[in-house]
């Protein structure tokens, strides 16, 4: 098929995340095969790909040119923030300010027990929060990272996005599994979701026991009471399964909304709520987005916008952030409800 577009991705990270970079490369190759059928290619550039032959530029200058030409810039951090990765991040920021590209996404891997982050990384995170309002993705395993990226890719390639589906706790694009929701904290650590999964497992056991044995009549037939009980168990299992499916879809939809935040500015409330959601703490995430506070800020933002002699880009962004808070609140509320009613 004719190639209509090439999505260029620049992946920046230090050597400490070599294994994650390798697996990410495999993901890109898988996605490239899927998108190729729609005339779209996905091209990944990493520092390992660079031709070391001298071409009149130092290597980092070449990397920086690649950053400017990319559609997506991904920076991965773990325990430290390398100076070249920071330089590439700043180049990407400047390019985005000038040409609205590349979209910038930052991933920070969770520390293991006993590990600590460097001062450089702590300062970089402070800069992103306090000065840039930039929200990063936290990940503890590759399922989480893959899911984040695929949702972000949907934002970049919005013209012909490939539908993300959830089937039996597996997030899929076409026939390819992207993530197991049992390994993603916003589902695996979600109390309601765990309770539903636990109840379904219990029902499966009870139905299995009833089907293999159960109470029998004098001539070996299954008793009327047992047949009724088995029918009730099957009916409840079907209901619980539908509740799980609804909540999985709502949770992934909320994660998609959060993906829209990532790579851009967001309010401190949105960032805190998103972090709590990612941890599976739906109730706390909802509580952070207090309606009285949001209404007061929205009223103030609208007043400033309406009374400005010439509305600025910052005033417009304030309005957009307020609207984003309400949208995120609605998504989080829905994602905490498994019952259809």
Q: What would you call each of these model-derived segments?
A:
Residues 55, 79-97:
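Conserved TIR/SEFIR loop-to-helix hotspot centered on a Trp-containing motif
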Residues 245-252, 261-262, 282-321:
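Short, charge-rich amphipathic alpha-helical segments embedded
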Residues 110-249, 253:
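C-terminal interaction surface of TIR/SEFIR-family domains
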Residues 95-112:
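A short helix->loop->beta-strand "cap" motif at the edges of active sites that frequently abuts
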Residues 107, 221-244, 277-287, 318-319, ...:
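Short coil/turn connectors between adjacent alpha-helices in alpha-solenoid helical repeat scaffolds
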Residues 1-72, 76, 98-102:
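Conserved N-terminal substructure of TIR/SEFIR domains
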Residues 231, 263-275, 303-336:
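Amphipathic alpha-helical repeat scaffolds of TPR domains
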């Amino acid at each position: 098929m004719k190639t209509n577009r090439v999505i260029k991705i620049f992946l920046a990270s230090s050597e400490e995340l070599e294994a994650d970079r390798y697996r990410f490369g495999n993901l890109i190759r898988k996605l490239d095969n899927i998108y190729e059928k729609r005339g779209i290619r996905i091209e990944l550039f990493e520092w390992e790909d660079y031709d070391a032959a001298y071409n009149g530029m130092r290597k980092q200058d070449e990397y920086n040119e690649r950053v400017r030409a990319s559609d997506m810039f991904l920076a991965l951090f773990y325990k430290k923030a390398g100076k070249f990765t920071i330089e590439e991040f700043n180049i990407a920021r400047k390019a985005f300010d000038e040409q609205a590209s590349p979209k910038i996404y930052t991933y920070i891997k969770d520390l293991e027990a006993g590990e600590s982050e460097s001062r450089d990384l702590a300062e970089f995170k402070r800069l992103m929060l306090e000065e840039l309002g930039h929200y990063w993705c936290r990940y503890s395993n590759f399922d989480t990272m893959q899911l984040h990226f695929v949702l972000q890719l949907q934002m970049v390639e919005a013209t012909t996005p490939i539908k993300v589906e959830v089937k039996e706790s597996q997030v899929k694009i076409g026939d390819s599994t992207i993530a197991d929701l049992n390994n993603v904290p916003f589902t695996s650590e979600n109390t309601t979701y765990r309770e539903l999964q636990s109840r379904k497992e219990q029902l499966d056991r009870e139905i299995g026991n009833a089907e293999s044995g159960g109470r029998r009549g004098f001539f070996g037939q299954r008793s009327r009471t047992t047949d009724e009980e088995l029918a009730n168990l099957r009916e409840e299992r079907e209901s619980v399964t539908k509740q799980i499916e609804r909540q999985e879809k709502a949770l992934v939809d909320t994660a998609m909304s959060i993906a829209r935040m990532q790579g851009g500015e967001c309010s401190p409330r949105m960032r805190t709520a998103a972090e709590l959601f990612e941890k599976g703490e739906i109730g706390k995430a909802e509580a952070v987005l207090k309606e009285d506070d949001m209404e007061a800020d929205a009223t103030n933002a609208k007043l400033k916008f309406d009374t400005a002699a010439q509305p600025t880009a910052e005033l417009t962004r304030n309005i957009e952030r307020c609207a984003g808070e309400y949208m995120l609140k609605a998504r989080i509320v829905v994602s905490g409800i498994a019952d259809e009613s």
